[in-house]
From Swiss-Prot:
It comes from Drosophila melanogaster. The chain crosses the membrane at residues 229-253, 256-287, 301-328, 335-356, 380-413, 416-455, 457-488, 492-519, 539-570, 571-609. GO terms for biological process: cellular response to phosphate starvation; intracellular phosphate ion homeostasis; negative regulation of cell population proliferation; negative regulation of JUN kinase activity; phosphate ion transport; regulation of cellular response to phosphate starvation. Residues 152-159 are annotated as: Important for inositol polyphosphate binding. This is Solute carrier family 53 member 1. Residues 423-627 form the EXS domain. Residues 2-218 form the SPX domain. Inorganic ion transporter that mediates phosphate ion export across the cell membrane. Plays a major role in phosphate homeostasis, preventing intracellular phosphate accumulation and possible calcium phosphate precipitation, ultimately preserving calcium signaling. Binds inositol hexakisphosphate (Ins6P) and similar inositol polyphosphates, such as 5-diphospho-inositol pentakisphosphate (5-InsP7), which are important intracellular signaling molecules involved in regulation of phosphate flux. It holds the Pfam family SPX.
Amino acid sequence: MKFAEHLTAHITPEWRKQYINYEEMKAMLYAAIEQSPSAELVEREMVTRYFAKFDEEFFHYCDKELAKINTFYSEKMAEATRKYGSLRSELTEALEMGHPKKLPAWKRRTPLGKKNVPARKIQDLKLAFSEFYLGLILLQNYQNLNFTGFRKILKKHDKLLSVDYGARWRTDHVEAAHFYTNKDIDRLIQETEQAVTQDIEGGDRQRAMKRLRVPPLGEQQSPWTTFKVGLFSGAFVVLFITVVIAAMFYGFGENWRAGMRMFRAPFLIIECLFLWGVNVYGWRSSGVNHVLIFELDPRNHLSEQNIMEVASVFGVIWACCVLSYIFCDPLGIPQYAAPLCLYTLMAAFLLNPTKTFHHEARFWAIRILIRVIMAPFCFVNFADFWLADQLNSMVPAFLDIPFLICFFGRSPTWHKAGKAASHCVEYVSLLHPIVAIMPAYFRFAQCIRRYRDTKESFPHLVNAAKYATSFFVVIFAHKYHTTTDTYPLSKENPWFYCWITAAIFSSCYAYTWDIKMDWGLFDSKAGDNRFLREEIVYSSTWFYYFGIIEDLILRFSWTLSMSLIEAGYIEGDVMMTILSPLEVFRRFIWNYFRLENEHLNNVGKFRAVRDISVAPMDCSDQTTILRMMDETDGVLNRRRGKAAGGKSATKKNKQEQRLLLQGESIEDLCS
């Protein structure tokens, strides 16, 4: 692998601009060679002057790159030093908890697990040290990659120009640079390993390193997993084509609406899951750090192939169940046993309490889902409102769940539906507005909670108003459908016009918010990226234009649906079954740009690891910190109001903000 590819594969995405610009420097070298005057056509002195001028420009560029790297490394090293001091202080406090101070120090310093320390405190310390260690490894990787980059490019310089100026410049400047000579990062890593081994894991280094280990950057996927994804995906495609052909020629029987509603929700879930896997692949390939954005464990999380594997396996099961439903009579099995079996398997997989089948990922999903349902009572993180947005694209699945509960609760036999199907259709129509509003309510409640925590009316109250418009759309649609007997013609029904007006307003509101707020497009400083933003992650600008147009079309797809249904060309259930997968696809495209926008926010803050707080923090503290971070120099200016000893205290603080000296440990600095 060439170094340029190695660098691209191993950089920390949030620090991308702070690395050596290896490609630009290599392009400068090749351009200089191509544009150099020919020694056969001009005097040798002119060639010498040309390369001397180029070397001046090239090494000036190297100076700028070196200064950039030194500055960033020093800032991150100082940040790591302060962070370790804080963690070490919390650990010392926890170690002394529950022991009288009169005891000797060696008796007080026993492992956390054997002391009277709250389990939550121990867990927070373990997580904080683990995340801090990851940040140290990323910084060490930054140090090594940049030194290797300078060594490679200067060696290439000497080889192409047949000189040794690059080697001498490396010796005089790079090998004497602060980012290379400073070894505090190695000492911090060693002291962190020692603290976790001795004070948290009771001297068990193997267990400590298992907790701290960082997965190899650019780790390859298991060939066995790749094989299974290909096998089950191919099988699903074949079976899906078979299902379509069988449905066209044999149909779903007399109660086709019941069959359609039974299999629609699982298909949407499977489609959504598979497209999430494609999302993860796209994010990873483009350098969007979804692991950080969702605050996943960087040492243990599902890859795109793991997600696709689960989706493709359930896709095969879904197709087999549909075929069993269609051919129930020749097979001699109860017709409605197939959908019940499908739902049972999916529920058993999700709720399986054993530590099998990606248990950590499943428990994470369940925990986030509970937080979504409890939206007004929980602090809202990115994963919470992202999942709630996904649920807003799966309203038909929500509508089918009450039907299933009613159907299997009333049906005396699994062979034939009887009157249960028609009764449950009427039953669901009464619950329709309540169930349809639920996903929008979850996001509405989250926005209100975020406003309560941050006291910022924009964007949170404005975003809440966007979801509130969905309430009116559902209510007016329900009133229209319940008054069709009173008003035989739609144009005579006043609720029809209320419904249309609310739907148009809601769609325009949602589309504008998608493009401007969620995706950050139509930036006035977009420059060459017309109608987009100044910085884009994905390689093709046409992908962004496709997303803008596709989102507009699918946001207003209800107009086509309403026209065809009102004209009597198609049944409502059939139209919903066709449009529901398209809405999931719209959300799939939306996910790319939403996470890109969040990723660029992290890049602006150089945030590459999770911010784990060990000390308890209430919402007011968190709100204050968020506001200070949003303000220019907000954290530095927070002491300006203090009159007594202001200047001397500032001077003292500046003296204390230093890196470790050679031979000095973190504990010496904190003591």
